[in-house]
């Protein structure tokens, strides 16, 4: 789940039932910055929020008073970086691993915030704390609690002569796992603590370099 101010207010409006996850839908693009030497240096993430969540953000910040789905230049300036105020411990819903070991990412750098057709789209960059050989790196975009659903449907770009592939999740297996976990919980616990199943619903991005 995203951990920034407006999200906390919006979450109060969301249905409480555990089975109703996810609540927020984000179309995602990933640009992987790799040097000519094959060293992974950074990732640039694009989040395009669904129309309903965008509307809630507008209302929370008293923007788009004429409800036409577009913002004035002044309103857009107020929105810049709205999703970059992350609480301590929040991973940014972006996870990189190599041979099963996590690769640490630095703090987010806001790149842009735009609004089109009533949807907010933001871009940010995160550098690796320690640059890493890109070959074999796996990237996943997911909220562990599955409150937010990310789909990498806006493209994967890899620079530096490496390539990337996208493998979609096995949704049948993912939903079966959710059902089994929920049925194993007391009803009151399921309502309060949704199982951390987000990774099961994530696209898998894999980098390869060389011939």
Where are these regions (language model features)?
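Structured domain cores in non-transmembrane regions
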Residues: 52-132
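Short, surface-exposed loop/turn motifs at beta-strand boundaries within globular domains
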Residues: 23-25, 38-40, 89, 117, ...
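Short, functionally important structural connectors and interaction interfaces within domains
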Residues: 4-5, 32, 44, 63
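Mature, soluble, non-transmembrane domains
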Residues: 97-211
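Sec-dependent signal peptide recognition
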Residues: 1-10
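N-terminal signal peptide c-region/cleavage motif recognized by signal peptidases
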Residues: 14-17
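Early extracytoplasmic/domain-onset interaction patches
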Residues: 22-49, 53
């Amino acid at each position: 789940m995203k951990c920034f101010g407006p999200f906390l207010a919006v979450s109060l409006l969301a249905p409480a039932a555990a089975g109703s996850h996810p609540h927020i839908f984000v179309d995602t693009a990933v640009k992987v910055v790799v040097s000519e030497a094959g060293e992974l240096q950074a990732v640039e993430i694009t989040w395009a929020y669904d129309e309903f969540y965008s509307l809630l953000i507008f209302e929370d910040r008293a923007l788009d008073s004429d409800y036409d789905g577009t913002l004035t230049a002044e309103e857009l300036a107020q929105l810049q970086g709205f999703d970059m105020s992350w609480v301590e411990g929040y991973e940014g819903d972006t996870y990189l691993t190599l041979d099963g070991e996590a690769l640490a990412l630095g703090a987010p750098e806001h790149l842009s915030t735009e609004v089109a057709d009533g949807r907010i789209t933001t871009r940010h960059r995160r550098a690796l704390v320690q640059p890493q050989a890109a070959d074999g790196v796996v990237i996943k975009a997911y909220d562990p609690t599955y409150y937010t659903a990310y789909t990498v449907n806006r493209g994967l770009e890899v620079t530096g002569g490496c390539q990337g592939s996208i493998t979609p999740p096995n949704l049948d297996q993912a939903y079966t796992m959710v059902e089994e976990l929920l049925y194993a919980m007391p009803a009151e616990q399921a309502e309060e603590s949704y199982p951390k199943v987000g990774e099961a619903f994530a696209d898998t991005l894999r980098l390869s370099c060389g011939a």
